[in-house]
Regions:
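Beta1-alpha1 glycine-rich phosphate/pyrophosphate-binding loop at the start
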Residues: 6-33, 62-74, 83-85, 112, ...
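A structured beta-alpha segment of the ubiquitous adenosine-cofactor-binding alpha/beta core
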Residues: 36, 208-229, 276-279, 342-388
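Local cysteine-cluster metal-coordination motifs and their immediate loop/turn environment
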Residues: 45-64, 89-112
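Glycine-rich dinucleotide-binding loop and its adjacent helix/turn
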Residues: 126-143, 204-221, 244-306, 413-428
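Glycine-/small-residue-rich beta->alpha transition segments that form the dinucleotide
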Residues: 234, 238-245, 293, 387-401
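FAD-site-proximal beta/loop scaffold in flavoenzymes
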Residues: 255-284, 367-447
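A conserved FAD-binding loop/helix module that cradles the flavin
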Residues: 299, 443-470
C-alpha cells in the first residue's frame, strides 16, 4: 500500500493517554500509557521522510528515526527494534525520559503548525512491544575475540559501552557499587517517569547478550583499581557526577535544607524496599525547590506525591529560558506546583531551621557568548517566602576518584576527566591520558542527559575496539 504523503493533514499529533493529575499524584508509577499497534502506525505514518532529517541530527545518538517510523507504519516491528538498537542501547528508556521537545521532536519539520511526530512515544512502543513479544538482539554472528574490558559504573554510559563491546566479541564485566544496575536511572529518576522494572528488563537483555555485572562492589575499596588494570585489556570509567552544586548563599546548612539527589535517591530506595537512612518525608510541609532543570521537576513532583502542603519552584530566569523539559514543567504545574519565575535565592532564613527563603526579583540581561541571558537583580525587590523545607537542585559537578592521579588519569580545572571524543594521531576516541583507560558520560562532559551518556559510552567502546585492534 502506497504511503499517504498527506497523512499529517488528516491525522493530527496524538500522544498516549496521560493519567489525570488528581489520580497520578496518589501513585508512584508512570503517568503515560502506551500506543497500541494501530496508534503507533498512524502516528509514524505522519513522518514526512525528509531528505535531510533534522530530527536524526538533533538526536544525540543519531537514531535512524524516519527509517524506524516507516517500519512501524508498515507493521515491521522486529526490524524497527533491530534498527533502533543499532544506535541506542536504551531506546525504551530514552523514549520515556529524553526531553524530546528540545531534541528530535523540537527539530521535526511538522513541529511548527502541525504538531511534531510523537517520536519518543513510538520509540518507547517499539522496544517495549518487541521485548514483550520475545524479540532479543541477534548475537548469533558474534565471534569472541578473547579480549576483556572492565566497565566501572552501570549507568547509561557504562551500559552503552558494554553493549557495543559484547556485540563485537569483547567480554564486558560491569562493576557498580549499587545493588542494582542503572545508576541514576534506578536510584535518581522517580518511578513516575521511569518504572524500575523497565531497567531490570534491560539488565536481563544485556545479560542475555553476554554482559556480566558485579554489583555491590566499590572500586578502590572492595577491589583495588590496580587489580582491574592487571586482569583486563582495558578499563572504561563511567561513574557519573553526584556532587551537588551549592548556591553559595547564607543559610544553606540550616536544618530543613536538602540536596536534590540524596532526597531523590532515598525516596527511590524506600520504594524499592532498600535501606534508606537518608529518607526525607515532606508530607504536610511548605516546600520550596530551587532550580529549573529536570532534577528540580523530579523534586517538585516527588514532594507533591509525599503529601507536601504546598510546593513552589523558584528559578532565576523566566520560563522560556529554563533548561528543563517543557513537558515536565507542564506535568508539575498540573500536579499543583507553583512556579516563581525570575526569583533568585539570596538567603535561607530561620532560627537554626528553615522558616523561609529570601529571594530577589531578576531581569534578564543581554545574551552571553553561549547565547544565555544572565539574570540581573532588581534593586529593592527582596522578599521572604515562607517555607518549612528547601530542596536545592542547581545541578551536579564531577567528583573524580582520589586514585585517578595514581594511574595517570588527568582531570581538567572543573574536575572532568580528560578524554577527547575525537581520535587523533596515536590516540583513540575517549581515551584518557593513561592509554589503557577510557572514560565517558557525565564525568567527562559534566552533568547532562541520559542519551548523551549513552552516546559517549558507545563511542568510547569504539575507541576501545580501536585500541585493542579488534
Amino acid at each position: 500500500m502506497a504511503k499517504n504523503t498527506f497523512q499529517f493533514l488528516e491525522v493530527g499529533r496524538v500522544d498516549p493517554k496521560k493519567l489525570d493529575a488528581a489520580e497520578r499524584v496518589k501513585r508512584s508509577g508512570e503517568i503515560y500509557g502506551n500506543f497500541d499497534k494501530e496508534g503507533a502506525a498512524d502516528q509514524s505514518e505522519r513522518c514526512l521522510e525528509c531528505g535531510n532529517p533534522y530530527c536524526e541530527w538533533k538526536c544525540p545518538v543519531h537514531n535512524y528515526i524516519p527509517n524506524w517510523l516507516k517500519l512501524v507504519s508498515e507493521g515491521n516491528l522486529e526490524q524497527a527494534a533491530e534498527l533502533a538498537h543499532q544506535t541506542n542501547t536504551l531506546p525504551e528508556i530514552c523514549g520515556r525520559v529524553c526531553p524530546q521537545d528540545r531534541l528530535c521532536e523540537g527539530a521535526c519539520t511538522l513541529n511548527d503548525g502541525f504538531g511534531a511526530v510523537t517520536i519518543g512515544s513510538v520509540e518507547k512502543y517499539i522496544t517495549d512491544t518487541a521485548l514483550d513479544q520475545g524479540w532479543r538482539p541477534d548475537m548469533s554472528k558474534v565471534v569472541a575475540t578473547g579480549k576483556r574490558v572492565a566497565v566501572i559504573g552501570a549507568g547509561p554510559a557504562g551500559l552503552g559501552c558494554a553493549d557495543v563491546l559484547v556485540r563485537n566479541g569483547v567480554q564486558a564485566v560491569v562493576y557498580d557499587k549499587n545493588p542494582e544496575v542503572g545508576g541514576l536511572l534506578t536510584f535518581g529518576i522517580p518511578e513516575f517517569k521511569l518504572e524500575k522494572n523497565v531497567v531490570k528488563r534491560r539488565r536481563d537483555v544485556l545479560e542475555g547478550m553476554g554482559v556480566e555485572f558485579v554489583l555491590n562492589t566499590d572500586i578502590g575499596t572492595d577491589i583495588k583499581f590496580e587489580q582491574l588494570l592487571e586482569e583486563y585489556d582495558a578499563v572504561f570509567l563511567g561513574m557519573g557526577t553526584y556532587t551537588y552544586m551549592k548556591g553559595g548563599f547564607p543559610g544553606e546548612d540550616k536544618d530543613g535544607v536538602y540536596e536534590a539527589l540524596p532526597y531523590l535517591v532515598a525516596n527511590n530506595k524506600q520504594q524499592l524496599e532498600l535501606d534508606s537512612p537518608d529518607y526525607v518525608d515532606l508530607a504536610g510541609q511548605k516546600v520550596i525547590v530551587l532550580g529549573g532543570g529536570d532534577t528540580a521537576m523530579d523534586c517538585n513532583r516527588t514532594a507533591i506525591r509525599q503529601g507536601a502542603d504546598s510546593v513552589q519552584c523558584a528559578y532565576r530566569r523566566d520560563e522560556e529560558n529554563m533548561p528543563g523539559s517543557r513537558r515536565e514543567v507542564n506535568n508539575a504545574r498540573e500536579e499543583g506546583v507553583e512556579f516563581l519565575w525570575n526569583r533568585q535565592p539570596i538567603e535561607v532564613v530561620g532560627n537554626g531551621k528553615v522558616e523561609g527563603i529570601k529571594v530577589v526579583t531578576t531581569e534578564l540581561g543581554e545574551p552571553d557568548e553561549r547565547g544565555r541571558r544572565s539574570p540581573q537583580a532588581v534593586p529593592g525587590s527582596e522578599e521572604i517566602i515562607d517555607a518549612d523545607a528547601v530542596v536545592i537542585a542547581f545541578g551536579f559537578r564531577p567528583s573524580p576518584a582520589p586514585w585517578f592521579s595514581d594511574y595517570g588519569v588527568d582531570i581538567d580545572d572543573g574536575g572532568r576527566v580528560v578524554a577527547p571524543e575525537e581520535a587523533s594521531e596515536g590516540t583513540c576516541a575517549f581515551q584518557t591520558t593513561n592509554p589503557k583507560i577510557f572514560a565517558g558520560g557525565d564525568m567527562v562532559r559534566g552533568s547532562d542527559l541520559v542519551v548523551t551518556a549513552v552516546w559517549e559510552g558507545r563511542q568510547a567502546a569504539e575507541g576501545i575496539l580501536d585500541y585493542l585492534a579488534v
